[in-house]
Amino acid sequence: MPIQILPPQLANQIAAGEVVERPASVVKELVENSLDAGATRIDIDIERGGAKLIRIRDNGCGISKDDLALALARHATSKISSLEDLEAILSMGFRGEALASISSVSRLILTSRTAEQSEAWQAYAEGRDMAVTIKPAAHPVGSTLEVLDLFYNTPARRKFMRTEKTEFGHIDEVVRRIALARFDVAINLNHNGKLIRQYRAAPDPAQHERRLASICGPAFLQHALAIAWQHGDLNIHGWVADPAASHTLSEMQYCYVNNRMMRDRLINHAIRQAYQDRLNDAQQPAYVLYLDIDPHQVDVNVHPAKHEVRFHQARLVHDFIYQAVTAVLQQTNAPILNISEEGEVDAPRWQQENRVAAGTNKYAQPEAAKSSAAEQAVARERSSARERAALAYKEDHPYQKQQGELYRQLLQPSAAAKPATSPAAIPASSVSSPSIPVQRITQAEEPLHGDNYSFGRVLTVFPPCYALIEYQGGVALLSLAVAERWLKQAQLSPPEEGLRPQPLLIPLKITLDKNEIAACQNHEKLLITMGIELSVEQGRATLRAVSLPLRQQNLQKLIPELLGYLSQHEEISPDTLATWLARHLGSEHEVWNVSQAIQLLTEVERLCPQLVQSPPAGLLQPIDIKAALATLTHE
């Protein structure tokens, strides 16, 4: 078959395959056109789930007689005229495909009148060449579009339409989403002659909650947390639901970019990540969020139905949304790690070359000066086995099976860096820290591989935080919470030149009292040593950087607590402060599993080998298996 230009009707029907998926798609496109026309009232009439009739009437600016024929043509639009316009879209529509595509798979009638015209005009397209016929009609200022017999000429498409109830349910959901985007517009939805939804205009922000309650329900409004966050050209506002009520609100997920409703994976991932430590795998967050961004920084022309966008600075937007939602959720009463203050001791210290400069939460194992090739091979094999187990955990993590698996790998520079959870309180008896001898590890000392520097194989984990391990020919219980605290204490103990600060993507504003401001000024050098860059102006502090172990913490809460602690001491050593911080940081996991335990112990063995040689009280408890076996075998 030779190459030929397709007839207009066939070309439009091909385009309709992307634009017109079902009756709800038609409603979305036509209502968005009404919004672009400046309508303040939109009436929607549906018959038989949209299969028989879809009528959209608005009081917008209307379409002049001269433009009616063009309105039904492909690639004809009043929204853009140049590439520069396309790169800064604020209107809902811009491709000029909707009306032509809809008219190719239905009987579409467009009636419109502008304020300058004394009479209205009606247009419809028919035939193979989609010729447009125009005739006078009676109509107020505004437009009415009637879509009759959708898919009448494409039986295959009509066959795939669902029941009347299902199709109207999709239409209802589209109208709900649009109503949440435009509080200033009154919208009425009728089905088979019966009024189903009536959303009155709510131009006053104080009235927005009324529409929010009518769409999302009183339960959402009761548990909603208002959010308002801004950074440069980025602004996010709206409501997120208290995680405690998520089990009843899982279907309430509405997100908008420049008032355009979205189901974007990056946005969903950022929100889900903010909630991940507060919800189990079966729960979903509930939210109504509005993201305002410079239109030059977002490309909306990447999805046929415009449900997804592409941000020019995707990581910035992702972290902005994550930080904003996280800051609001932290206002809820989440459990806080409670560790006893008794027995503070300095953390194990070692040479700086054992530290990785930046970019990951891993620390390198010191080189062994006196190790044979065979010993090194054994050490590499043990390390490789543990790393494979840790990698298996990352690949099987329940959250990565949710939406955004690709984005989690794409947007997080380190798979090991996760937002801190809010663990349950740990008994003080399990985390006491008796004084133990601490020696600096040098290259001249005994190598750090071999059984002397390994806890042993993890057999199982007893919730919430105890691992059963092989130990010295027997078994022992190990407290993962205590091991994690010692690891963080070691990571936070600075070398002579101090911890390296890691700049925050978005500087954090923190309100301080007089004592906290004084502590910030008096201990400025100490904070710099700990990798914390904090400046104070007019009673407000700006946090610009923290050391790597602190990046995933609740800094809005941790920094004031840290300054409050410093205000009680005129002089304090970096190691003492590292001990205090380790006791007040959130745990990585509320309930541990075997893979997480293996990953933690691998890091402890590399970074704190002294804990393997001389376990502190509360870390390890050997179990007398021989006595238990003797009891079982006793006759």
From Swiss-Prot:
Belongs to the DNA mismatch repair MutL/HexB family. Pfam families: DNA_mis_repair, HATPase_c_3, MutL_C. This protein is involved in the repair of mismatches in DNA. It is required for dam-dependent methyl-directed DNA mismatch repair. May act as a 'molecular matchmaker', a protein that promotes the formation of a stable complex between two or more DNA-binding proteins in an ATP-dependent manner without itself being part of a final effector complex. One of its GO terms (cellular component) is mismatch repair complex. It comes from the Bacteria. PANTHER family: DNA MISMATCH REPAIR PROTEIN MLH, PMS, MUTL (PTHR10073), DNA MISMATCH REPAIR PROTEIN MLH1 (PTHR10073:SF12). It comes from Yersinia pestis bv. Antiqua (strain Angola). The keyword Metal-binding does not apply. One of its GO terms (molecular function) is ATP hydrolysis activity. CDD domains: HATPase_MutL-MLH-PMS-like, MutL_Trans_MutL. GO terms for biological process: mismatch repair. This is DNA mismatch repair protein MutL. Keywords: DNA damage, DNA repair. HAMAP family: DNA_mis_repair.
